[in-house]
Amino acid sequence: MPLSRSLSMSSLPGLEDWEDEFDPENAVLFEVAWEVANKVGGIYTVLQTKAKVTGDEWGDNYYLVGPYTEQGVRTQVELLEPPTPELKRTLDSMNSKGCKVYFGRWLIEGGPLVVLLDVGASAWALERWKGELWDTCNIGVPWYDREANDAVLFGFLTTWFLGEFLAQNEEKPYVVAHFHEWLAGVGLCLCRARRLPVATIFTTHATLLGRYLCAGAVDFYNNLENFNVDKEAGERQIYHRYCMERAAAHCAHVFTTVSQITAIEAQHLLKRKPDIVTPNGLNVKKFSAMHEFQNLHAQSKARIQEFVRGHFYGHLDFNLDKTLYFFIAGRYEFSNKGADIFLEALARLNYLLRVNGSEQTVVAFFIMPARTNNFNVETLKGQAVRKQLWDTANTVKEKFGRKLYESLLVGSLPDMNKMLDKEDFTMMKRAIFATQRQSFPPVCTHNMLDDSSDPILTTIRRIGLFNSSADRVKVIFHPEFLSSTSPLLPVDYEEFVRGCHLGVFPSYYEPWGYTPAECTVMGIPSISTNLSGFGCFMEEHIADPSAYGIYILDRRFRSLDDSCSQLTSFLYSFCQQSRRQRIIQRNRTERLSDLLDWKYLGRYYMSARHMALAKAFPDHFTYEPHEVDATQGYRYPRPASVPPSPSLSRHSSPHQSEDEEEPRDGPLREDSERYDEEEEAAKDRRNIRAPEWPRRASCSSSTGGSKRSNSVDTGPSSSLSTPTEPLSPTSSLGEERN
């Protein structure tokens, strides 16, 4: 084994890599998380999609460590015998001492090996281990917090496993243990407390305190430096959890977060600056449709249109060919996920479309699981009526076609008055009468348990979007995960996303954001924010995100009302696009898929592991940190198909126009403005200040020559036109509705 290895630049700008290809022969990687073969939240997606890339790098020296769950093992894991004698002795030793440890292969792409620890079977040691945690780390865990108690059991079992594995190996390998989130953090703290020779990494996908604070309607990002973190955690009764998370962040050799915005948050709340940002990727191959993705969009849209026909029966007075489908999906966190600002923007969009006489209709879906007790009867009836109409039309069509065929067969033109008999007319009239309804189409597809206090329904009542015939924006709240077996909307989530036109995710708190990333790899434009990890990442890597269908909403430096105005502008501009423009934009969006592939983003994790090895084993690995400017990284240029700005265009002919007063190379008039590079640079320096976001920007023109404005346009650029009046007073909304 070489005694020293050095790190150098990889093909990815800004990241370090081994000078030679890393040889994992004498190194073992354990990735520890509560969501290994146990779907709870987004970390499950991270581990599942990243397993193939990590397995290609580490081979059979890569193991995932997670909790044993009967459901997970029965459906996702194939139990196996350990492949190495050291690992077999480790499991046998733990099982003989009262633990239950299982080994198998996770049945996902890449087929990683997993070690599953039965937390419940070790509950006999909980009180003793909680006492040891207090003696070692001064962290006390209350008896009533089951999740925290499970974290203690899981942490001690993980540490026991790693220590036993090292003891059973005669040739001590270099062990890297990567812990995800606070639920696995206890194990990291104990590894350091017991001085195990393990290189440790801790990744936080969202800080505990940050999620709680943002859910409480706090001006979070403007007060990051002012929070009394101990007091805030104590008031929310999560102080012990916060201590676990903070201790893990400080004990780790390498601390990482999933985005730059979360890194800022962690620096202030956990009091340690992350060593590296490890963005979340996707298995792009799973979503790849090559040139077929436009056809898939049309097919999926047809499935959604079938649902819309049934849902709006009796009020289907809008053209489905001129209807756009927007959606928001995710955990039901009304403010954190931006459902509040989305609803307000939809009300303003409805006003703009009505005032301007637009023929476009927008159907906005809210896919957020909530507490329900059954399907809405009106919604089920709508789908039944649609199917009945379809059956009636098919019956009449078959009779009509048979009579037409027989008439043509004898060589005569059919008598149109005899093609349909009275029975057919009666059947069609009954079908028409069935489509009549007195009430508006329902907003919610299910019966909500907390109908009167539900935040989405309460807001809809306030803004008055009741799916009336006069509304150009329709709202459908589907408080359940999508499934292809549903009697209402029988499509899975991926098919639904492909059929929509725009995903809207104006989140206030979103450490990464898989939903807009999934839209991107499927070629669907999306709206994200500069407070989400995905939005910050795309803003950093793309010169003009909006040209690629990635709209970045400013929620960090603008007020809530101004952010809502900007979102309204994005939505209205999107509605003004032609069908051809939307097709071109979807093509551009789909091109960004490779940027989100784990084959690219997995290198950030590689860099974190190399950094941890260099810190844990400095005698064998060296690491030379250095700063790299973000501008040195690759940035997607503006698409060539986007029309250039008029200010940057050039004459297409060398000959002057008749209305030009002077030749292009001739002397300038005295009253015209000369361009002085140093003077303009000085103006720019004077204009660099904290962003101020006025409600409307004003433009001034001067006579006698062109004058440059002394203000800098700090708003995000967009290749689409924005409405002249993106806002109207709330009173105007009410007057128009009345």
Swiss-Prot record:
Post-translational modification, as annotated: Phosphorylation at Ser-8 by AMPK inactivates the enzyme activity. Primed phosphorylation at Ser-657 (site 5) by CSNK2A1 and CSNK2A2 is required for inhibitory phosphorylation at Ser-641 (site 3a), Ser-645 (site 3b), Ser-649 (site 3c) and Ser-653 (site 4) by GSK3A an GSK3B. Phosphorylated at Ser-641 by PASK, leading to inactivation; phosphorylation by PASK is inhibited by glycogen. Phosphorylated at Ser-641 by DYRK2, leading to inactivation. Dephosphorylation at Ser-641 and Ser-645 by PP1 activates the enzyme.
Compositionally skewed regions (Basic and acidic residues) per UniProt: 682-695
Residues reported in the UniProt entry to bind UDP: 39, 331, 515
Regulation of this protein's activity per its record: Allosteric activation by glucose-6-phosphate. Phosphorylation reduces the activity towards UDP-glucose. When in the non-phosphorylated state, glycogen synthase does not require glucose-6-phosphate as an allosteric activator; when phosphorylated it does.
Pathway membership, UniProt: Glycan biosynthesis; glycogen biosynthesis
Keywords of this entry: Allosteric enzyme, Glycogen biosynthesis, Glycosyltransferase, Phosphoprotein, Transferase
Protein's name in the database: Glycogen [starch] synthase, muscle
Source organism per UniProt: Rattus norvegicus
